[in-house]
Structure formats: structure tokens, C-alpha cells
Swiss-Prot record:
Record protein name field: Pentafunctional AROM polypeptide
Keywords: Amino-acid biosynthesis, Aromatic amino acid biosynthesis, ATP-binding, Cytoplasm, Kinase, Lyase, Metal-binding, Multifunctional enzyme, NADP, Nucleotide-binding, Oxidoreductase, Transferase, Zinc
Source organism per UniProt: Verticillium alfalfae (strain VaMs.102 / ATCC MYA-4576 / FGSC 10136) (Verticillium wilt of alfalfa)
Cofactor note: Binds 2 Zn(2+) ions per subunit.
Pathway: Metabolic intermediate biosynthesis; chorismate biosynthesis; chorismate from D-erythrose 4-phosphate and phosphoenolpyruvate: step 2/7; Metabolic intermediate biosynthesis; chorismate biosynthesis; chorismate from D-erythrose 4-phosphate and phosphoenolpyruvate: step 3/7; Metabolic intermediate biosynthesis; chorismate biosynthesis; chorismate from D-erythrose 4-phosphate and phosphoenolpyruvate: step 4/7; Metabolic intermediate biosynthesis; chorismate biosynthesis; chorismate from D-erythrose 4-phosphate and phosphoenolpyruvate: step 5/7
Ligand binding (7-phospho-2-dehydro-3-deoxy-D-arabino-heptonate): 132, 148, 154, 164, 196-199, 250, 264-268, 271, 287, 356
EC number: 4.2.3.4, 2.5.1.19, 2.7.1.71, 4.2.1.10
GO cellular component: cytoplasm
Coiled-coil boundaries: none
Region feature (EPSP synthase): 397-837
Keyword Kinase included in the entry's annotation: yes
Cofactor(s), by name: Zn(2+)
């Protein structure tokens, strides 16, 4: 870095001395000499951070040494400290002081603080206290430090209680501002500093502010170039000017008020609120970003208090946003950076309470009175209530307007006229001074857009009240960046035609886009008209809405243009205004019926005339217009009328409250149709109206005296219908409003919105094709909306309901307060100042209004894929799992057409006709059966481009299009054998590979079936498919439950192939909550192979999957540079619905963004690993990685390397601090043997290994069992006691079962026997502190029920409890005891494990079952069979009365029937295929039962089914009933297996851990099982 010229740098005086030095390149060849000449010392101590040291310290040391003549010259000591706010601490200060003392520094030492604000603040405080004060110099390297923190002598360190709370005023001897440092400053840091530059101009110098406005594009363009020498050369002079200007302001203020007595407080403009935001959002939000938001909020506060005009607020906000700084918490960048963290208003006020400007409890805030001027020469005292209104998301309106009120309200400029004026002036030639321009979001979007198109230049005059716009006569250039228009419908429609006038520049087209609502608002008729006139326009979204790509062809052709104008008059105005610049004269013909909102078309014609273009209206057809070629001539001055739609709100308040309001600048001569509202609506409702050509005054009747309107046509003023509706709500009678059909496609469906929100007030409404009907209620019957009024982000909804709130019976909350900024940013100020209403801030945030939101979880599913891939099978599975009807579209097409598909193809229709009918059917079901169904499509559906468009649009709108595939060779083999469908006309494999990209394009999910076609046709959905459907369509409860656990684990699968490890996977996943597939360790990483591995893993593990590609640099095996393969594998994982994606934060931005955009229901684990141990948890070096992970992740994973045990404690402190700041879950670990403690203490989703795996995924990894044992030793897991209650129980195998499983999973619990038949003995045990759960057997299964707090539904129906589970209450330490029954679960498990499928929908015929016995276990068996879909269920017992008692106690839908004897068996319509015996087996079976059972067992069945007898007695192991069944060819299940199964379920309920069932079986049978998983 060197000086570019030999001139002396510029100096700025501060406190009477020229101590601030500013120029380019002074660090190396000027600072050393100045130090030696003017800041002499024997020792200079240069301190900087580790990021800057290597770049800037060695060359300075070289220059320093070169300037020292003798060995006796001064010495230079250098020190590097960690970067970031964490270094601004007592510990860092002590470290520096101790080091300086060790270097024998004395009182003549000079500290050189090289760095940003952290370095300057902290080193200044060191200088202030070292040896009672030594000299120091500031060398700021960031723009923020150059213009702010380095100037003024404020020094400080942070404490745990807050920032800058301990420090001193200590002036630097020199401040060297070398602008060359900014060449390497990252763009975000540079822009961060611009906030302080804007601040000083805003409070002190309007001229400098104007300079900042004018130079924003060039400054931002330069800053966004890659860092390095010459980057800022294009802005060299302006950069120096703005830094000098800002530094001079601060120096002048400090010189007048060094110790912050009053004037210096002005430098805190934006900081009172900004610091509060920063306190909650740091470190993710930078200081300048927080201050930028704070400036806007404090300016809005000044406007609310009546000391600042709205135009100044708008001007400030636009200047801030023009530099890329945020202006609200709703800014997309802020949401992304902070992970959407909320800032509760009460917490913000608490943070503001410790502001040093405050006077005791009185908060003081710097208020602007104009740009460049403050309200007072100090901070102003402001009440908390006013601050809360500005900070809150919603406004609480307390009703009560003085009945004597007579007020005058001037609404802002008309949005409609403002937008038209900007278009006309930009297309025109010359300069136009535009007065009363609306300062709102919509108009700002328009102004920004025409500037970006090069259509005009502009400046502000009269403190922002006048826009001076110079048009360029229609010379527009295409924009390389998309023009974002938010929810500005007017701007989007006008600009669609204007952009068609652009000529190519660096690009040959321009993209118009907007927010989510704008992307569903219609624009099709306008696009159709322009397309027909030769303009190339592409829809970039699924519907006929924005975003649009519009070709830059230098204008449209002209001639005759036909346009449908029944939806929006803005389509007409858009073409009219651009028509003079068409290549030929234009004849615009409006077709399709009566144009909507004719007054707005007339407004456009009148304004065009003012700007020099006369449109000729056809004498023969009033809906045809002739526009000659021409150029607009800008008038010298144009005044925007106030907005007539907005004027309806203050006039309506007068009407509803019985007061008087005058709008002084809207009258009968207005261009706007809504100006008729007072005469056409308010006067017939009973108001007194006085209207002149230029003003309107309304006086309302006494409150409650408004009259309903039997019918009013509001087509000329459709936007005003919302105002009329709220008045009608309290008017006598019923009001019918028509002519407003277009209001369904505005910012929201306004008719539906008004009906829903009026309903909250108890108002009855109805609607018809083009209107709404409102039945009024007396004022005293109005209800108060408990959850507030939801505004749909629609300004007119918010303002209308604020009118109704003025006469409510209790305060009303209007949600989404800031949406009024679209047309009247100061509306709430007007309510307070002009109408005297008491407003309060309400921190309510709107929830989702379900009726107007598409519930994607209920959307129909469309399945695509090759014939033979399993579409029909998986469709039936999915329909069963989701409880939806399934429709095979091939079969449906055959049904509707009355012919088979081969008949269609080989008949007159042919392939073309078949595809046409297939497409028509797809369109029909998408339109009419869009929710609650599962459809499978024909394999060739993707051959049709139109069908592909439908499928793509469906998935892009949130629908599920599922691609089903299995091994390609299996599909081919199947198709070669299938003769039921038309043969392919080409090679089957060629067909598949041609269609594969089409299937991928049309689908957003894919299921790879690992099961051969023959093995699944008649089965229940396999485990892998059930997991898949739960992941993509389920309620997410499985993952939510997992992540809510106090201790959760995932096992890292380190195998080269899942297929080769399927036998060991069930063992290694025990005790874990998820399984990590290390894709980088797989031998075959091709997409099809990985898809097969994912499906195989789901089958083997049955739990959520973490999909991980660990790169070489982060300790894995995947190549760091293979971005293409990485992205393709991530996309595959997302399409397969994996529950978690481990996404390394070192991937390029495009990978992170793509994965985030496509993630759907998958959760991102944003990870960073440091295998080389280069980062420290102690010094803040992990903070940037945490911040980056916070932007992208649902979970954050940070893995370091432990060099000492202390590293684990540092990690724990870091994690605690981060979790205190943000709720995003954090996995934070240290690798290595010394890091094991961090794994034990991690808690959330700890990665674990297992001895059965070939190797550990990371050094120091432990098993889940080892971690649980360690947690027990540390006291984090308490040993609990589990019991079996009953009598006799001495021979029970339950203790063996549960104690084996406790040991296996590393839990310290014990299970023992409590032999009793007395319920009161049980009552004492189950309330003991260490009680963990219990099993209950006879005779207590019924007796324990009154002792419990809750009993499950299944236990209630069965009438018996065999399991007691302690359930912690939310937010309470008191436990509730739940009684459940696992006997039936054990039975179901045993049946399923032997291959008995659920009968609920598995077959088209019914399947029956038989239960033998009449005791308590009989009831559990009946419940098990019912849950498995069997009906009827027959019962067989000796005592017929007992059977009748049982039958009567169950609901009738159980379909229970007593079986009388052998003869009755022959009369059964459906013979049982499952028998459950619940009678004792240690005694001979009753002969009559035996005879009947033998007949049942030998009865033939109509379908080929697995026939099973389940024995509930486990002594002896092989019973008489089992022998009978086996002799008849039935399969049998011994009772010991059911005992193991019900106990296995009990263990899961108690611990949340699912062990292997074979381990439970082994324990019950007394077989040897592993005693440990270590």
C-alpha cells in the first residue's frame, strides 16, 4: 500500500488540534515519519488482530525499521490478538497489559491500534489505564471505525451485562485514516460503515445527504467488485469526500461536547433503537445494519410524534436501502442472517432502558425534524407508549373519538396518480417538479425501477417534498438485475408494457418479479395483448403471473391491439401510456365486455393530455382508442392529488363516530373515481356532505345512526368497497355492494378477507358473483376479535378495520401494522394526531389464516414412472397410509371411455387420441380432485409437453409428484413378460433413458423400491416406504419428538455398502434416534446406487436418516472440488425425502442456496469440522462459522479438535452463549480422546459409533451406551426403579427381560418384583421419586386404574392396565402417571413378524379371526384383532354368559360373535385365519372347545392366506392348541414371544429406546445375549 501522490494528506481539527489525518496510502510512507516527528516515544506497541497482522504489520515494520537511523532509535513491538467482539473483554485487556509489562513498557509508550472498532475501543482503554494513562493512536481499517469509533475518545470493553459498560474518555494523539485500507474491506463491512455516514449527514448536513443519495449507485457498484487494489478507484474522490464529511461532523460535535453533555447525543441518532436490536441479534447482525433499522424506526417515531414530515422518512429509508442496508426486521437479508429470530418489544424496551442518554427512567431519543436537522440540539424524552407503537408488529386501538371533534386531514398523494406521473415523466422529455408524490413502498418500487432502466434521473428539493425528475424521452435500457416490485400491482402492470420499450444493453431482456402474493396475481390479459403485438414475454413461474421475462426489442409493433379489460383497468392504462412509443400508431380495442373502473382509464387519458399526448376516443366505439406516435413533453410542475381511496378512511371515521372531517384537496373535480365516495355512499348512509370542486367535508350522524344501502354499485370506485363494508357493519339494515369482482385478485381476495374479518366482530355477510352483502349490527353487540384483525398484508384491509375499531366495545388489535405503508405510511400517526385516538403497540404476530392458505399436506399425490416400476402398488400403499382413495388414471381412462387402452391405440383414436384423452383426464383431476387423493399416471404421460407443464406447475405450487422407480434391469425384465399393455415401439431401455430426464423434471420426490415386483404385490407397505411417506407427507411428529428429547443420538454408519451391512444395522442403531449415511464412504456413489442404499437403510433401520457427504478437508473422503457431483447427490437425497441433510458451510453459495430452496420438509444440519484444530472455542474464531450455519441450518453442527480438557469447557461456554442468543439446536463436539467429555455432555443429536461397525466415524467417538453410563457417573442420568406388580409372579421372566435391555443400552435402571395383590401397596411405590415405570399383571390390572392420573384409550376399551408410564407435565416437575396396555401391541407385533398383513385394506374380501377364552387377556386379543382389521371376530369359551358380557362391553363396530359349537363352524361365511388362545395351557382343554377348534383349524379358506394360531400361555412352551394347529397345517406362535413383545413395547414406552426384538426374546427364553454394546 503506497501513496498515489506526494501531496500532504487532509487534516481535520478536533478539540483544537489537527489530529485527524485522511488520505489514500498514508500507512506505509507517511505514518512512521509523523509518529517520529509528532508522537515521539522510545517504544511503539502495534496491536492488531490475527486477520490483519500478516497483511499490514510486516510491511509497516519494514518501513519503521527503514526510518530508524541508529540502533538506539525507538523500538516497535507487535502483538496479534483474536478478531471479533470476544476480544473486547477484561481477559483480553489483562493479557495485553501483562504482555506490555513483560516487555518493560513505560509511561512514554505509544500504542498503535490497527483495526476496526473492537481494536480501537479496547486498546484505547488499555492506554487510558496502563500506568495511569499513556498515549495511543488510532489506525482504523474499516469504514465504520474511520467515521465513528476512532473519533471522539470513547474507549471501552464489554462485560457479561452488556457492551461498552466499562471504559473511559481518552483522546487519541492521532487518528490516521488511510482510505486504501478500504480496498480490501469486504462489501458487507463497507456497507455496514455507510450507516454511520448516512447518520451524520441525516442529523447535520442535507447537502451531504443529497450527495450520498446521488452517488449510491456508483458507490455500491464499486464496493461490490472483488476486493483488491484499484477496486475503489472509480469512486476515489467521492469516497474521500464522504469520509471527510462524516468525520468532520463527528469532530465538530465532539469538540463542542467532549464528555457527552447533550449535543454529542445527536451522534446516537438511530442508536437508541438500533442498539436494542443489536443486543438481541448480534453477532449475526452488524452494528451498522442494526443502526440502519434504528434510524428508520426513530424517524418513524418522529413522524408519529408530529415533528417530522412523511416525505423525510421516505427519503431517509430510500437512501439507506439504496446502499443495501436493511430498513426493517422484515428485510429478507435480516431474516436469513438471524434465522428469523424475533425481537420481543418488551425486551427491546428493557435494552433501551440502559441507554446512557436516558434521564433516569425517561428514555431519550434523537428526533429528526428534517433531513440534516434535529428536533432539539440534544436527545428528546419520549414516552414508552409511543416507542412501543413504533416497535410493535401490530397496533391496539382504543375506541373513543370526541363527539365534538372537527378535524382536517390531508391524505398522501394518490398512488394511482403518482405511479402514472412517474411513468409519464420518465418517458417524457425535460424536467418536471412533482409535488405531493406518495412516499410509499409501491411508489419507491416504481421510482427504483425506472431509474434502473435508465429512463430518468432525479433529485429531491424542499426537504424531500418535491421530486425533480428529468425524463429521457423513452430511451430505456434492459436491466441485468431483476426488477423486484414487492406486492406493487400497479407498478407491475404499468412496467410490463414500459419494459417492452427497452433496448438491449448488457442483456437482451428484463425480468419483473415480486413477492409471493404478486406471483399469483393475474397479468395474463395484458401479456396476451402484448404477445399478440409481437412482444416476446415468458412466464417464469407456474401461473399467468409474475415473474416475467420481457424481451428488449425496442418497443412493440403498434397497430390494432385487442385487450380484455374486465379484470383490471390498469392493463388498459399500461398500454395507453406506452402507446406513443410504439413502432406504429396504436388502436387499442377493449374486448370481453364492459371495462372495469372506467374512471381510472379516464384519469390516464387526462394525465397523458397534461404531458402533451392527446388520445382520440373512437366516435363509433367508446371502448376503442387511437394513439398517435409521439413524445411526452414534461410540464415544469405537476402536483399529485391526494389519494381519494385513502381519503375514504378519515371521512368514514367521521361518519361512524358522528364527528366532522374535511379533506381539503379532493373534491368533485378530482380525476379519481373514489372521490365520489362521499356523495354516492356516505350521503345515502345518513351523513351530511359538503363537497366543492377541491374539498370534501363529512359530518356523521350520531353513533349508531348510519343507514344501510339496499344496493350500491361501486364499480367506479372498487377499492373503496372495504370502507363501505365496515360502515355497513354498524348501519341499520342490509347493504348490498356490487361491481367489485376485481377485488378478489388484489393484494388478497378482499371479498373473502372482509367476510372473514367482519365475522370476528359478529357481522353476518354473504357474497355473490361481483359483490358482498353485509347485515349491520347495533354498536353495542359488536364482538371483539380475540386474536386481532388479520390484514393479509393488505393496506386497505388494515385501514378499513381501523375505522371499525374506533366504535368497538373494547380495544382492537390490527395485525401487520406496517402494511399501511403501501399507500399511507403515516396512517397510525393520523389516527393519533388528528382523531385523538389512543394507540398502543401490540407485539402480536399474525398466525396463518388457514382458509386462505393452501394446506400442502392434503394436496393430492400424482405418481409417475415407467410401467412395471410399481406405481400402482406404491399408490395403493400410499393411499392406505394416508387414508385416501387411490385412482389409477389408466384404469380411470378406460372406465370413462368404455374401452381398454389397447383398443384406443389400435382403434380410431390412435396414439395421438389416447395421449389427448390422457392429458384431458390429468387436467380434470388436477382441477377437480386436487386434494385428498392418490393418483398413478400412465408411464408415458411425460411424453406430452402439455402434461409435463401441468405436472411441473403442480409440484412448483407445493404439490407432490412422486417418481417411482426400481432397479432398471428388474423393470425391463418385467416389461418383457407383461403382455397386458401395448408393446413399446422401441427398445425398452431406450424408452427409459429417454424418459428419465422427463420424469426427473416433472417430479419433486422419488421412491426407489428395493423390492422385486413379485415380492410386494400382496404385502402391506414395507418399512422403507412407510418411513418415506412419513417423511414427505407425514405430520413431522417423529422428528419433532426426537429433537425434543433431553438426550438424542445418531449412529454414524461407516460401511462401504448398506446392502452388505443389512444384518448388522438393526443392532448398531439400537439406542440411537437417527442413522447417518456417510455417502462419502460408499464404494459406489452413482445416483442410482445411492438411491438403492437410502432405501435399503430405511428398510433395515426404520428411523430418520442423516445424509452426509463429508469432504476431505473436513475429515471425510468426498473430493472438495467436485461440486457438480455433490449437488446432484444432495438433490437426490432431497427427492428421496431424507429427514436431515448434513450440509458443509464451506460449499459454494450456489450449492447452499439450491439445497435450501429445494429442501422441502428435510432439515439442514449446517456443519463445519476442524480436524486440524486451527479454531479455538475461546477466542471467537468459531463465531463466523456459527453465524454462517445459523443462516442456513435448522440444526447447527460444529466439530473441533481437543488439545486439552480445557477445550471441552470452552466449548460448553461457547455453546451455552449461542443457545442463549438463538434457539436453533446446536451439536458442538471436540474430536480426539480428550474430546470425549464434549460428546458425553452434548445432549442433542450426539453422533455415536457401535462396536459392530468396521471403524469409528471420528476420533474419540463413543457408543450411545457408553455415553449413558458416563452421564450416570456424572449425575446427569438418575438410576430409576421399575417393578412388576401382581401375585403370583416369582417365575416371571420380566426382570430378566428389562434388566438385560437396560444393561444393553447403558441405562443404570433396575427392574424388580413387588409381589402383592393389594392396590394400596402399589399406590405408595408408584409415587416414589425414583419410580421409573411398572408392569402390572393379575390380579391388579383393573385395581390399579383408579391410582393413575390418565388411562389410554386402548386400556379403557380393554378394561385393563398392564403398564404404568410416568409422564412429565410441560413446564412442571410433577409427573403424571399414565396407564396403558401393551398386551395387544405384543400380539399384533407377533402376527406381523410371521407375515400376517393388516386386513384393514389389504384385501377386497373380509378376513375373520377367533379368540378362545373369556378372561382379561381375551379382551386384549379382541382389541388386537380389531386393530389389525379383522371382522367378524368370533369368540369361543365354555361359559356362554361370559362371552355375552364381553360382547356387550365392546363397541358394535368390533363385530363380535359367539361361536356355539362345531356345527356352527360349517355355516360361517368366512372361516377364521387367525386364532388367539387365551385359556390356561397347564390343564387339559375342555372337550367341546377342542372339538370346535379342530373344525375351525381344518376349515378351508377362499383366499391363500397365512393361517396362524397365537398362544398366549407361555407355560408350557408347546401347548395342546399349538399341536392341533400344526397338525392342521397352521403356523403357531408360542406365548413366550408375546410376553417378550409386550415387554419390548413397555421398554420403548419407558425409555424412548427401541431395542432389537431378538434381544428381548433371548432374555425371556434365557438365551445368552450380549451384556454390553461397548
Amino acid at each position: 500500500m503506497s501513496c498515489s501522490n506526494n501531496t500532504e494528506p487532509t487534516r481535520i481539527a478536533i478539540l483544537g488540534t489537527d489530529n485527524i489525518v485522511v488520505d489514500h496510502g498514508i500507512w506505509l510512507n507517511w505514518v512512521t515519519k509523523d509518529l517520529f516527528d509528532n508522537v515521539k516515544s522510545s517504544t511503539y506497541v502495534l496491536v492488531t488482530d490475527t486477520n490483519l497482522y500478516d497483511t499490514y504489520v510486516p510491511p509497516f515494520k519494514h518501513a519503521f525499521d527503514g526510518a530508524t537511523d541508529t540502533t538506539a532509535g525507538p523500538r516497535l513491538l507487535t502483538l496479534a490478538i483474536p478478531p471479533g467482539e470476544i476480544s473486547k473483554s477484561r481477559q483480553s485487556k489483562a493479557h495485553i497489559e501483562d504482555w506490555m509489562l513483560s516487555q518493560q513498557c513505560t509511561r512514554d509508550t505509544v500504542i498503535i491500534a490497527l483495526g476496526g472498532g473492537v481494536i480501537g475501543d479496547m486498546l484505547g482503554y488499555v492506554a487510558a489505564t496502563f500506568m495511569r494513562g499513556i498515549r495511543f493512536v488510532q489506525v482504523p481499517t474499516t469504514l465504520l471505525a474511520m467515521v465513528d469509533s476512532s473519533i471522539g475518545g470513547k474507549t471501552a470493553i464489554d462485560t457479561p451485562m452488556g457492551k461498552n459498560l466499562v471504559g473511559a474518555f481518552w483522546q487519541p494523539s492521532r487518528i490516521y485514516i488511510d482510505l486504501a485500507f478500504l480496498e480490501t474491506l469486504p462489501s458487507r463491512e463497507f456497507i455496514n460503515g455507510m450507516a454511520e455516514v448516512i447518520k451524520t449527514a441525516a442529523i447535520w448536513d442535507e447537502n451531504e445527504f443529497a450527495t450520498l443519495e446521488a452517488n449510491a449507485p456508483s458507490i455500491v457498484a464499486a464496493v461490490n467488485q472483488p476486493t483488491g487494489p484499484g477496486r475503489l478507484s472509480p469512486i476515489r474522490e467521492i469516497l474521500k469526500r464522504i469520509v471527510l464529511g462524516s468525520a468532520r461532523v463527528k469532530a465538530e460535535v465532539v469538540s463542542s461536547d467532549e464528555r457527552e453533555g447533550g449535543l454529542r447525543n445527536l451522534l446516537n441518532f438511530g442508536h437508541s433503537i438500533g442498539h436494542a436490536y443489536e443486543a438481541l441479534l448480534t453477532p449475526q447482525l452488524l452494528h451498522g445494519e442494526a443502526v440502519a433499522i434504528g434510524m428508520v424506526k426513530e424517524a418513524e417515531l418522529a413522524r408519529y410524534l408530529g415533528v417530522l414530515r412523511p416525505s423525510a422518512v421516505a427519503r431517509l429509508a430510500k437512501c439507506i436501502s439504496s446502499y443495501g442496508l436493511p430498513t426493517s426486521l422484515g428485510d429478507k437479508r435480516v431474516i436469513k442472517l438471524t434465522a428469523g429470530k424475533r425481537c420481543p418489544v418488551d425486551i427491546l424496551l428493557q435494552k433501551m432502558a440502559v441507554d446512557k442518554k436516558n434521564d433516569g427512567r425517561k428514555k431519550k431519543i434523537v428526533l429528526l425534524s428534517a433531513i440534516g436537522k434535529t428536533h432539539e440540539p440534544r436527545a428528546t424524552t419520549v414516552e414508552d407508549a409511543a416507542i412501543k407503537v413504533m416497535l410493535s408488529a401490530s397496533t391496539l386501538i382504543t375506541p373513543g373519538v370526541s363527539t365534538k371533534l372537527a378535524t382536517t386531514v390531508t391524505p398522501p398523494g394518490s398512488k394511482s396518480i403518482s405511479n402514472r406521473a412517474l411513468i409519464l415523466a420518465a418517458l417524457g422529455e425535460g424536467t418536471c417538479r412533482i409535488k405531493n408524490l406518495l412516499h410509499s413502498d409501491d411508489v419507491e418500487f416504481m421510482l427504483t425501477a425506472i431509474t434502473r432502466l435508465g429512463g430518468a434521473s432525479y433529485a429531491w428539493e424542499d426537504a424531500g417534498e418535491v421530486l425533480v425528475l428529468t425524463g429521457k424521452g423513452g430511451q430505456l435500457r434492459a436491466s441485468s438485475d431483476p426488477l423486484y416490485l414487492g406486492n406493487a400491482g400497479t407498478a407491475s402492470r404499468f412496467l410490463t408494457t414500459v419494459v417492452a420499450l427497452c433496448s438491449p444493453a448488457d442483456v437482451s431482456s428484463t425480468v419483473l418479479t415480486g413477492n409471493a402474493r404478486m406471483q399469483v396475481r393475474p397479468i395474463g390479459p395484458l401479456v396476451d395483448a402484448l404477445r399478440s403485438n409481437g412482444v416476446s414475454i415468458d412466464y417464469l413461474g407456474p401461473g399467468k403471473s409474475l415473474p416475467l421475462r420481457i424481451d428488449a426489442a425496442g418497443g412493440f409493433a403498434g397497430g390494432v391491439i385487442e385487450l380484455a379489460a374486465t379484470v383490471s383497468s390498469q392493463y388498459v392504462s399500461s398500454i395507453l401510456m406506452a402507446a406513443p412509443y410504439a413502432k406504429e400508431p396504436v388502436t387499442l380495442r377493449l374486448v370481453g365486455g364492459k371495462p372495469i373502473s372506467q374512471p381510472y382509464i379516464d384519469m390516464t387519458l387526462a394525465m397523458m393530455k397534461t404531458f402533451g399526448v392527446q388520445v382520440e376516443r373512437s366516435s363509433s366505439d367508446p371502448n376503442t382508442y387511437h394513439i398517435a406516435k409521439g413524445t411526452y413533453k414534461n410540464p415544469a410542475e405537476y402536483t399529485i392529488e391526494s389519494d381519494a381511496s385513502s381519503a375514504t378512511y378519515p371521512l368514514a371515521i367521521a361518519a361512524i363516530t358522528g364527528t366532522t372531517c374535511t379533506v381539503p384537496n379532493i373534491g368533485s373535480s378530482s380525476l379519481q373515481g373514489d372521490a365520489r365516495f362521499a356523495i354516492d355512499v356516505l350521503q345515502p348512509m345518513g351523513c351530511t356532505v359538503q363537497q366543492t370542486a377541491s374539498s370534501t367535508t363529512v359530518t356523521g350522524p350520531a353513533p349508531g345512526g348510519l343507514l344501510g344501502l339496499p344496493h350500491v354499485d361501486m364499480e367506479p370506485m372498487t377499492d373503496a368497497f372495504l370502507t363501505a363494508s365496515v360502515l355497513a357493519a354498524v348501519a341499520a339494515g342490509t347493504t348490498k355492494i356490487s361491481g367489485i369482482a376485481n377485488q378478489r385478485v388484489k393484494e388478497c381476495n378482499r371479498i373473502a378477507a372482509m367476510r372473514e374479518q367482519l365475522g370476528k366482530f359478529g357481522i353476518a355477510t354473504d357474497e355473490f358473483d361481483d359483490g358482498i352483502i353485509v347485515t349491520g349490527q347495533p354498536l353495542d353487540t359488536l364482538k371483539t376479535p380475540d386474536a386481532g384483525v388479520f390484514c393479509y398484508d393488505d393496506h386497505r384491509v388494515a385501514m378499513s378495520f381501523s375505522v371499525l375499531s374506533t366504535v368497538a366495545n373494547a380495544p382492537v388489535t390490527i395485525l401487520e401494522r406496517e402494511c399501511t405503508g403501501k399507500t399511507w405510511p403515516g396512517w397510525w400517526d393520523t389516527l393519533s394526531q388528528s382523531f385523538g385516538l389512543r394507540l398502543n403497540g401490540d407485539d402480536k404476530h399474525p398466525g396463518v389464516e388457514g382458509r386462505h392458505q393452501q394446506d400442502h399436506t392434503t394436496r393430492s399425490v400424482f405418481i409417475v414412472g415407467m410401467r412395471g416400476a410399481g406405481k400402482t402398488t406404491t399408490g395403493r400403499w400410499m393411499a392406505k397410509l394416508l387414508k385416501r382413495p387411490f385412482i389409477d388414471l389408466d384404469e380411470e381412462l378406460e372406465r370413462r371411455s368404455g374401452m381398454t387402452i389397447p383398443e384406443m391405440i389400435h382403434g380410431t383414436k390412435g396414439w395421438e387420441g389416447f395421449r389427448r384423452d390422457e392429458l384431458q383426464l390429468l387436467h380434470d383431476v388436477m382441477e377437480n380432485q386436487a386434494s385428498g387423493h392418490v393418483f398413478s399416471c400412465g408411464g408415458g404421460i411425460v411424453e406430452s409437453p402439455e402434461a409435463r407443464k401441468l405436472l411441473i406447475a403442480y409440484k412448483e405450487k407445493g404439490g407432490c409428484v412422486l417418481l417411482v422407480h426400481r432397479d432398471t434391469k428388474q423393470v425391463v425384465d418385467y416389461l418383457l413378460q407383461d403382455k397386458t399393455r401395448p408393446a413399446y415401439r422401441e427398445d425398452i431401455e431406450d424408452v427409459y433413458y429417454r424418459r428419465k430426464p422427463l420424469y426427473d423434471e416433472c417430479s419433486n420426490f422419488q421412491y426407489f423400491s428395493p423390492h422385486p415386483a413379485a415380492s410386494v404385490a400382496s404385502r402391506d407397505a414395507p418399512l422403507d416406504f412407510r418411513c418415506f411417506v412419513d417423511a414427505i407427507c407425514g405430520d413431522g411428529s417423529k422428528v419433532t419428538k426426537m429433537t425434543a428429547k433431553e438426550q438424542s443420538f445418531f449412529v454414524s454408519l461407516t460401511v462401504p455398502s448398506v446392502d452388505s451391512a443389512v444384518d448388522v444395522i438393526p443392532q448398531v442403531v439400537v439406542g440411537s434416534d437417527a442413522v447417518e449415511l456417510r455417502v462419502d464412504l460408499l464404494q459406489d456413489q452413482t445416483p442410482e446406487s445411492v438411491a438403492r442404499q437410502v432405501s435399503a437403510l430405511r428398510s433395515a433401520a426404520g428411523m430418520p436418516i442423516i445424509f452426509t457427504l463429508r469432504t476431505v478437508s473436513q475429515g471425510g473422503c468426498f473430493p472438495d472440488a467436485d461440486h457438480t457431483q455433490a449437488l446432484s447427490l444432495y438433490i437426490l437425497a432431497l427427492r428421496m425425502g431424507v429427514e436431515f441433510i448434513d450440509l458443509e458451510m464451506t460449499w459454494p453459495e450456489h450449492i447452499l442456496q439450491t439445497v435450501t430452496n429445494l429442501k422441502g420438509r428435510s432439515r439442514i444440519i449446517a456443519s463445519h469440522h476442524d480436524p486440524r484444530g486451527e479454531l479455538s472455542w475461546k477466542n471467537g474464531s468459531w463465531t463466523p462459522f456459527y453465524n454462517r450455519a445459523l443462516q442456513w441450518g435448522s440444526v447447527i453442527k460444529l466439530v473441533g479438535t481437543a488439545q486439552s480438557m480445557e477445550d471441552n469447557y470452552d466449548l460448553a461456554r461457547f455453546k451455552s452463549d449461542m443457545l442463549a442468543s438463538h434457539p436453533t439446536p446446536v451439536i458442538a463436539l471436540n474430536m480426539g480422546a480428550l474430546g470425549k467429555l464434549s460428546r458425553v455432555l452434548n445432549g442433542f443429536l450426539t453422533p455415536v459409533s457401535h462396536p459392530a461397525l468396521p471403524f469409528k466415524a471420528a476420533p474419540g467417538q463413543l457408543s450411545a451406551a457408553e455415553i449413558r453410563r458416563a452421564l450416570f457417573l456424572l449425575g446427569n442420568i438418575n438410576a430409576q426403579s421399575f417393578h412388576l406388580f401382581g401375585k403370583p409372579i416369582s417365575k416371571s421372566r420380566s426382570p430378566a427381560l428389562h434388566n438385560s435391555l437396560f444393561n444393553l443400552t447403558g441405562l443404570p435402571h433396575k427392574y424388580g418384583l413387588v409381589e402383592t395383590d393389594q392396590a394400596d401397596e402399589v399406590a405408595a411405590v408408584i409415587r416414589e421419586p425414583d419410580f421409573g415405570g411398572a408392569s402390572v399383571t393379575i390380579p391388579l390390572k383393573l385395581d390399579v386404574m383408579p391410582l393413575l392420573d390418565e388411562v389410554s384409550e386402548s386400556a379403557k376399551v380393554i378394561g385393563a392396565v398392564n403398564t404404568i408410564i410416568p409422564m412429565p407435565l410441560d413446564g412442571s416437575q410433577k409427573r403424571r402417571l399414565l396407564g396403558d396396555n401393551t398386551d395387544w401391541r405384543g400380539m399384533v407385533h407377533c402376527l406381523e413378524s410371521i407375515g400376517v398383513a393388516s386386513e384393514s385394506t389389504a384385501s377386497t374380501t373380509t378376513a375373520s379371526a377367533l379368540v378362545i377364552g373369556s378372561g382379561g387377556t381375551t379382551r386384549a386379543a379382541i382389541f388386537a384383532l380389531k386393530s389389525h382389521g379383522y371382522h367378524p371376530i368370533y369368540m369361543l369359551a365354555r361359559n356362554e354368559q361370559s362371552l355375552e358380557t364381553i360382547r356387550a362391553s365392546f363397541p358394535t363396530d368390533f363385530d363380535l360373535r359367539a361361536l356355539g359349537g362345531p356345527a356352527e363352524v360349517f355355516t360361517l361365511a368366512v372361516a377364521p385365519t387367525v386364532v388367539i388362545s387365551t385359556i390356561p395351557a397347564d390343564k387339559p382343554m375342555d372337550p367341546s372347545l377342542r372339538e370346535t377348534l379342530e373344525v375351525v383349524l381344518k376349515s378351508p379358506v377362499s383366499e391363500q392366506r397365512t393361517r396362524v394360531l397365537l398362544e398366549m400361555a407361555y407355560q408350557p412352551r408347546h401347548t395342546a392348541a399349538m399341536r392341533l394347529a400344526e397338525d392342521a397345517g397352521w403356523r403357531t406362535i408360542p406365548g413366550a414371544e408375546v410376553l417378550a413383545a409386550q415387554g419390548w413395547h413397555q421398554f420403548q414406552m419407558w425409555t424412548g429406546i427401541t431395542p432389537r426384538f431378538i434381544d428381548a426374546q433371548a432374555a425371556v427364553n434365557g438365551d445368552e445375549i450380549p451384556t454390553s454394546t461397548d
